[in-house]
């Protein structure tokens, strides 16, 4: 019976590792391609040719052309840079901000903890995308403002995770010994607290990449993100939605790109969570 349990555990571990390798490779390939997208496009993504406007997919233009005769494949490839880079930047910002607030609350405690946690409660009580729409509406359109708007409402989750982990570490015997040794607060946080709480925070960040990508695309679709003619998947869908019935390939192309990218990052996040779960190592 023990051998059977061990065998099942081994199969589970190997399966999780295989998934981790597969989705890591796919995610890295997606990120690398987005950064070198200008070298991968078969045509200039900004080049207009009204003679072939709204052309259906052909051998020369596998994804067809848009209303201005621009090659859709080139637009989708070029749009990966703005879509993926802005998503990674957003997740990095909210992870850093939320972790900083959470560690501060957990370590300092008292009034600081109470005030910052009540502020986070306010943000958590309001539907995220609705609040982001309001912030983006005040700041105005643009990809930078969309990132600021989503960052403003997305950090509380990370703050709560970092705070709970910091409180747990703060009460351990070895941490009390470190504090009694006379080490400075900054050194303790950087050397002892952050390395021990970063795991759950990073897992949450990986799971959030797909969500943030969709929310950025949603803001762009509503006209509050990237502005034409900059190729960005959400704004490309918004710019072509009136052609959905007559030239559906123009709208479907960036939509499929969003779907595939979100699926890859979501599956990678799920796999990292499974890999970090102690049960998967039994």
What are these regions (language model features)?
Residues 136-138, 150, 165-166, 214-257:
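Glycine-rich helix-loop "coupling/hinge" segments at transmembrane-helix boundaries
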Residues 153, 199-209, 248-282:
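C-terminal transmembrane helix and the adjacent membrane-cytosol boundary/short C-terminal tail
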Residues 31-68, 222-230:
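Hydrophobic alpha-helical transmembrane segments of membrane transport/permease proteins
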Residues 74-87, 137-157, 249-255:
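Loop-to-helix entry region at the N-terminal start of transmembrane alpha-helices
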Residues 62, 66, 97-98, 106-168, ...:
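Generic hydrophobic transmembrane alpha-helix motif, especially the helices
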Residues 65-70, 107-108, 167, 177-187, ...:
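Short helix-to-coil transition segments within interhelical loops
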Residues 1-43, 119, 197:
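N-terminal signal-anchor/first transmembrane alpha helix
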Residues 72-107:
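Transmembrane alpha-helix signature in integral membrane proteins
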